[in-house]
């Protein structure tokens, strides 16, 4: 216990003494008091001769001078001083507004640049919503008309594609309606699957009738000549003569025996 108490007291005393010495040195550091104390010590001890110390050369030949801030006029034009930026304020709706979107003042003054030249920046209002923008209303209307409007060629192309799509949908609907397992649906939506007959004109029919009355059977050479004159194929001429002969046989069967 005694040893620890002695060490603690010594530690406290050393701290107190150092603090007192610092206070005294800071409080009585003036040159007049130091000279007075030195003269009193010399008078009290006359036996000792005063010591004269030779002055040593200073390490630095020139005296230190405080560094002065350079004026803005001497700075080059490329130098731009640091400008403090205002803190970003929160928007009313809780979002942060970016600083580079804020409108800049009309003229900017820089200390390093001559004041005679002004860099004008046109302020542009930043609209938060599209409904708030009133300055660009005419441009927006023009753009909307341009984007919404279509050229006549585009309209024709769209109409043609629309009609083709309608035709495809109708054909698909017909295919859906014609179900082989549902005969009633087939009967209601049935279409003629027979190939269309070749339409003969009145002039062609008249010439074929004349040729049939003259000769019911045609040779191959005569068939070729008739087809070339009437602008038909040999197959068409052959089929027409076959049908005409069948029709004539049917008429002959239906006649009574007395009329034969």
Curated annotation (Swiss-Prot):
Function: Sequence-specific transcription factor which is part of a developmental regulatory system that provides cells with specific positional identities on the anterior-posterior axis.
Region described as Disordered: 157-181
UniProt name for this protein: Homeobox protein Hox-A9
InterPro entries membership: Abd-B_homeobox_TF, HD, HD_metazoa, Homeobox_CS, Homeodomain-like_sf, Hox9_activation_N, HXA9/HXB9/HXC9
Polar residues: bias regions: 160-170
One term of GO molecular function: RNA polymerase II cis-regulatory region sequence-specific DNA binding
Family listed: Belongs to the Abd-B homeobox family.
Pfam families given in the database record: Homeodomain, Hox9_act
SUPFAM superfamilies recorded: Homeodomain-like
DNA-binding region: 193-252
Keywords, comma-separated and alphabetical: Developmental protein, DNA-binding, Homeobox, Nucleus, Transcription, Transcription regulation
GO biological process, one term: proximal/distal pattern formation
UniProt key word Lyase: no
Subcellular location: Nucleus
One annotated Gene Ontology cellular component of this protein: nucleus
Organism of origin: Heterodontus francisci
């Amino acid at each position: 216990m005694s040893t620890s108490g002695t060490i603690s007291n010594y530690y406290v005393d050393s701290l107190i003494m150092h603090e007192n010495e610092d206070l005294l040195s800071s409080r009585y550091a003036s040159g007049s008091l130091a000279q007075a104390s030195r003269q009193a010590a010399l008078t009290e001890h006359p036996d000792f001769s005063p010591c004269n110390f030779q002055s040593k050369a200073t390490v630095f030949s020139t005296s230190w001078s405080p560094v002065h801030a350079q004026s803005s006029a001497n700075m080059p034009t490329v130098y731009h001083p640091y400008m403090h930026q205002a803190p970003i304020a929160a928007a009313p709706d809780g979002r942060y507004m970016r600083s580079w979107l804020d409108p800049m003042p009309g003229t900017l003054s820089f200390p390093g640049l001559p004041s005679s030249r002004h860099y004008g920046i046109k302020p542009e209002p930043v609209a938060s919503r599209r409904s708030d923008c009133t300055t660009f209303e005419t441009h927006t209307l023009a753009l909307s008309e341009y984007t919404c409007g279509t050229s006549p060629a585009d309209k024709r192309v769209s109409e043609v594609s629309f009609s083709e799509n309608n035709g495809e949908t109708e054909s698909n609907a017909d295919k859906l309606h014609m179900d082989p397992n549902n005969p009633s649906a087939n009967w209601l939506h049935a279409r003629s699957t027979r190939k269309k007959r070749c339409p003969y004109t009145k002039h062609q029919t008249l010439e074929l009738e004349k040729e049939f009355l003259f000769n019911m059977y045609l040779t191959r050479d005569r068939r070729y000549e008739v087809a070339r004159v009437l602008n038909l194929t040999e197959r068409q001429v052959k089929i027409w003569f076959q049908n005409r002969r069948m029709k004539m046989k049917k008429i002959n069967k239906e006649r009574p025996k007395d009329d034969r």
